[in-house]
């Protein structure tokens, strides 16, 4: 079997590795560097990738960087009159990595394992896979960056049971994953993150500071000058790196622009203390996901045996100090933050080819998946942090008599109401035979494959007819949306709870009306007409209340109707008992049906444990 290369397709830098002699090795690029800037430039119809494109960015406006931030969206870059999608730009980077890997190996490479941030959603993962396909690579597996890092770290430690926390702060994304290592099994317990936080944001803080200082001294806004801005960007990145090793750095940019009196130069001394002050809020944003990952794994900081740092931004002293303070231990320094992810991807490639044995990788899905059910509620089928690959089925029913079709609205997110979550796709199961509500059995199945990509299927168990969809949303979730989901879930917990209670109240009331209609038909001629009219009046009042949004009134009318129907049932059984006693007293009456039980609008059947929910 041909070799499978491991690729870390990063926001700022990318790397490629291969398994040789049982060890993962980084493949250097043609310039001799072990990582390649994720930068693409277009000039006179020619494409430039990596360091060459990055160096030319100052004079070439047709230069694209940090395209990974737009994966899974409809974003387009227009270059020389042509639109490029994020997948196409990423494919150009992948093609370059593929070409120099082939030169190094002396053979054609057509298979790869590509890493993505753990918090990437379905659309972003699909976009990454598509980029690989465009680049001429068969993507054997999409794996999470922290998981790949753990694989590289733990390959020679498979005999020791330990719990590790991977802290991954890259150029554009931030992830925290907690894994358990032991007996060759790498099991992810939880993952959390922020897809809008990375080294680029630290650079921007320095750029904004330099722009403000220059404007204060010279009255000129450099942010309006594209060439000056590119020079500032390069200088900010260099200053950030310098301040990881020294406490002060000099930023010197001669001839940055020109004023009325002639050329102007930028000279600023940036201290580590000032840098820490500028970026304090960014460092603080790493704390909440870290705590969330621990909480989801049901662990405390003291349960963590090792902390692994991934991504160049983890070299920032303030970041390391925050980790140490939060987790109470020094981070492990035995792995290279820039290379460890690609190496882990190469090891996963070795697992697939069979070159690496006795290693099992168990990853998780970062966000909950479900469908919209009556009342606008999201019914979750697969909870976040569920080990993948996985599949889950539940059985639902129709909400109306003779309903000919059901719409399946597939959702991803943590909020209880459907409207507050992200739509992954919609499809319809049609041609359901006419039947009363609640009779048809519609089985909805979710499958998440080893790459974290979702397939949803709906099947009418009565007819065997089915429909399915592979989620290939072109827009996907933006970084902002995915971060907003979890934050909104926490900030709006009370409102969510109230909305869900109201939806359930409305559903229960609607079900009660349906049950009462059925009961009144059964009682026809068996109880006094006046009692029936009383029940019908209460039912009509509840139906009227259901047209509005006064949930207190709906609750009151529901309780009132419930009480009337219960009394009717009691009288019916008392009457039947009296008749039997008069006729000689037949014993062994069936237990009365409890019409006080109010079901939801659908029936769920959990295939895993065969229990009704």
From Swiss-Prot:
Record keywords, A-Z: ATP-binding, Chaperone, Nucleotide-binding, Phosphoprotein, Stress response
SUPFAM superfamilies, alphabetized: Actin-like ATPase domain, Heat shock protein 70kD (HSP70), C-terminal subdomain, Heat shock protein 70kD (HSP70), peptide-binding domain
Modified residues (Phosphothreonine): 173
Residue stretches spanning the membrane: none
Entry annotated with the keyword Protease: no
CDD domains: ASKHA_NBD_HSP70_DnaK-like (cd10234)
Region listing for Disordered, in residue ranges: 578-613
Induction: By stress conditions e.g. heat shock.
Keyword Chaperone: yes
One protein family per Pfam: HSP70
Any one GO molecular-function label of the UniProt entry: ATP binding
Extent of Low complexity compositional bias: 578-591
PROSITE patterns in the record: HSP70_1, HSP70_2, HSP70_3
Acidic residues bias: start-end ranges: 596-613
BP-aspect Gene Ontology terms: chaperone cofactor-dependent protein refolding; protein refolding
HAMAP family in the record: DnaK
Family statement: Belongs to the heat shock protein 70 family.
Function description: Acts as a chaperone.
Protein name, per record: Chaperone protein DnaK
Organism for this UniProt entry: Listeria monocytogenes serovar 1/2a (strain ATCC BAA-679 / EGD-e)
Lineage: Bacteria, Bacillati, Bacillota, Bacilli, Bacillales
Name of the gene: dnaK
